């Protein structure tokens, strides 16, 4: 009787000492101060994008011809236009808030457009290394040999400007990274004993791919998706600056930069505000990606 009670006490102590993976992840993520700051900034940006119709002080398309190129409020401006106005008299703050909706939407959608086929192609390359693998990987090598922005511009030249085409172009540019990462992770997992046991138990190909192997490859994929999200925001801003992305007068950060490039010296705020917004968003997402890597990578945990 005493032995059973002691064993139960030891088991209870072990259960209390071993936190759940979610609790362990949150604890490790919170230890990275930069990641927490990046998460806070992106929460603010996301809330601003979702609540844009209610928190934006003005219509982003409304033109006030009497207040064109009005300076920000802290430099002899007025409180009606806190961050000033652009060359058409449109409120910069309102356009930044509404532009966040477009940038985040395109970023998230392009990541999903690249993630899903990238995972499928990567798994096919890992499970069929003699047949489909070489063909898929050589195609990815050719795509990676081209500069990403040049490839995106080439795709946009074929498809034409527009929001959907910009999403497709960015997804094509980021696709090889997902394929290579999925293939590498899956090939490591294929050597594990649990995969052999699943095969001996009669698991089919699809079950092996998406039930046995894929869940164990998600950690590096999530980290890569986070970093690709920041690259997607940069790419859509670059395409908008070149006139191939979101078309005026729709508010989008890159398009705002393109329309303001003639006023860099005379009205610095027209260029500085969207530029700082892009910088803060991309930096915050990269900090979040570093935090996810530190929290999800078991090798880094062993080193620490």
Question: Could you say what each language-model-derived stretch is?
Answer:
Residues 28, 55, 82-85, 263, ...:
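Residue-level signal for helical boundary/lining positions with a hydrophobic bias
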């Amino acid at each position: 009787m005493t032995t059973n009670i002691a064993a139960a006490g030891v088991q209870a102590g072990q259960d209390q000492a071993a936190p759940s993976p979610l609790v362990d992840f949150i604890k490790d993520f919170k230890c990275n101060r930069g990641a927490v700051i990046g998460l806070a900034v992106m929460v603010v940006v996301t809330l601003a994008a979702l609540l844009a119709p209610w928190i934006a002080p003005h219509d982003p398309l409304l033109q006030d011809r009497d207040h064109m190129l009005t300076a920000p409020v802290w430099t002899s401006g007025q409180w009606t236009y806190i961050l000033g106005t652009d060359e058409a008299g449109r409120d910069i703050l309102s356009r930044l808030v509404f532009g966040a909706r477009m940038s985040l939407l395109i970023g998230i959608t392009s990541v999903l457009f690249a993630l899903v086929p990238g995972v499928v192609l990567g798994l096919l390359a890992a499970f069929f290394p003699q047949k489909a693998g070489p063909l898929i990987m050589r195609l990815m090598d050719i795509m990676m040999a081209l500069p990403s922005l040049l490839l995106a511009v080439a795709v946009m030249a074929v498809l034409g400007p527009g929001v959907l085409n910009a999403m497709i172009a960015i997804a094509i540019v980021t696709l090889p990274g997902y394929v290579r990462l999925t293939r590498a992770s899956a090939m490591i997992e294929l050597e594990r004993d649990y995969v052999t046991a699943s095969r001996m138990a009669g698991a089919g190909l699809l079950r092996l791919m998406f039930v046995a192997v894929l869940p164990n490859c998600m950690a590096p994929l999530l980290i890569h998706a986070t970093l690709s999200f920041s690259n997607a925001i940069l790419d859509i801003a670059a395409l908008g600056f070149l006139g191939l992305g979101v078309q005026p007068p729709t508010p989008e950060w890159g398009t705002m930069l393109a329309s303001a490039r003639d006023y860099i010296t005379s009205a610095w705020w027209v260029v500085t505000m969207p530029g700082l917004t892009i910088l803060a968003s991309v930096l915050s997402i990269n900090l979040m990606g570093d935090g996810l890597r530190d929290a999800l990578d078991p090798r880094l945990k062993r080193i620490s």
